[in-house]
From Swiss-Prot:
Transcriptional regulator of sporocyte development. Acts as an adapter-like transcriptional repressor recruiting TPL/TPR corepressors to inhibit TCP transcription factors. Required for nucellus and embryo sac development. Plays a central role in patterning both the proximal-distal and the adaxial-abaxial axes during ovule development. Involved in establishing the prospective chalaza of the ovule and in controlling the cell number and the length of the funiculus, and is required for the development of the integuments. Required, with BEL1, for cytokinin-induced PIN1 expression in ovules. The lineage of its organism: Eukaryota, Viridiplantae, Streptophyta, Embryophyta, Tracheophyta. One of its GO terms (molecular function) is DNA-binding transcription factor activity. This is Protein SPOROCYTELESS. Disruption phenotype: Complete male and female sterility. GO terms for biological process: anther development; sporocyte differentiation. Contains 1 EAR motif required for the interaction with TPL and TPRs. Residues 1-17 have a biased composition (Polar residues). A motif (SPL) lies at residues 62-70. InterPro entries: NOZZLE, SPEAR. Its main location: nucleus. The gene is SPL. It is found in: Nucleus. Expressed in flower buds. Not found in leaves, siliques and stems. Detected in rosette leaves, stem tissue and seedlings. Keywords: Nucleus, Repressor, Transcription, Transcription regulation.
């Protein structure tokens, strides 16, 4: 007598599709003649196993040049640094607040070499640095040099210009040239032949020197104008062809081109006891000689490397 077989699953929760059930089960007949079903075991790898995941291989560095290897190393360091600083906004803010202030060179086209320059209110800087003026922000000395505060951090390779003091320091802190006091110690301070007065360090406006030269003599003395023959050479030729010639020599009663006359400081223009005095570079041209006071000198760049001493008797 034939009997029919019924395939029954013992796990009711796993029954979904009858076709899947028949596909994943098999008939097992034991020694006692009982028939039972067993589910097929999956021999595949587990989806979360580490062995199944392929490890990312690093690119081979063999055959690359030294320059490429160094460049790649720098790029990797930058990537690691960028990844370490992402999300750390507090540290970035603290770094930006305590940023190092470095000397910023001024445009040499605006500030002439060898001339004390004023940039803004009560900001006077020492001239004569080859590529422009040295400017550091925190504190400005009243005598034309800059002074950095104690909280400012600077690189060890950059010099630290301190406050200029004629009585305590005998060298210029910007160009490190030895200074010397000429005549009256309270009036003229010189460095390598060039001199300037402590009381007259306000330069003419930056929008043009020729307009300043056309002002009256009293106004020039009150503003503390310091004449430099190099500025005269760089000025426009049209200034000498105007109706009021600023290059009029009081001693010889002659007028001449801007290269023929220089000037020197005498006395203290603040109280009206002195000012700019002119003299000729070529006194024999007009048949008269102009005496020059020995203790004063023509003002040239205080820190300029190519300083010309014009304090000789002509």
């Amino acid at each position: 007598m034939a009997t029919s077989l019924f395939f029954m699953s013992t796990d009711q929760n796993s029954v979904g599709n009858p076709n899947d059930l028949l596909r994943n089960t098999r008939l097992v007949v034991n020694s006692s003649g009982e028939i039972r079903t067993e589910t097929l075991k999956s021999r595949g790898r587990k989806p979360g196993s580490k062995t199944g995941q392929q490890k990312q291989k690093k690119p081979t560095l063999r055959g690359m040049g030294v320059a490429k290897l160094e460049r790649q190393r720098i790029e990797e360091e930058k990537k690691q640094l960028a990844a370490a600083t992402v999300g750390d906004t507090s540290s970035v803010a603290s770094i930006s607040n305590n940023a190092t202030r470095l000397p910023v060179p001024v445009d040499p086209g605006v500030v002439l070499q060898g001339f004390p320059s004023s940039l803004g209110s009560n900001r006077i800087y020492c001239g004569g640095v080859g590529s422009g003026q040295v400017m550091i922000d925190p504190v400005i000395s009243p005598w034309g040099f800059v002074e950095t505060s104690s909280t400012t951090h600077e690189l060890s390779s950059i010099s630290n210009p301190q406050m200029f003091n004629a009585s305590s320091n005998n060298r210029c802190d910007t160009c490190f040239k030895k200074k010397r006091l000429d005549g009256d110690q309270n009036n003229v301070v010189r460095s390598n032949g060039g001199g300037f007065s402590k009381y007259t360090m306000i330069p003419p406006p930056m929008n043009g020197y020729d307009q300043y030269l056309l002002q009256s003599d009293h106004h020039q003395r009150s503003q503390g104008f310091l004449y430099d023959h190099r500025i005269a050479r760089a000025a426009s030729v049209s200034a000498s062809s105007t109706t009021i010639n600023p290059y009029f020599n009081e001693a010889t009663n002659h007028t001449g081109p801007m290269e023929e006359f220089g000037s020197y400081m005498e006395g203290n223009p603040r109280n009206g006891s002195g000012g700019v005095k002119e003299y000729e570079f070529f006194p024999g041209k007009y048949g008269e000689r102009v005496s020059v006071v020995a203790k004063t000198s023509s003002l040239v760049g205080d820190c300029s490397p190519n300083t010309i001493d014009l304090s000789l008797k002509l």
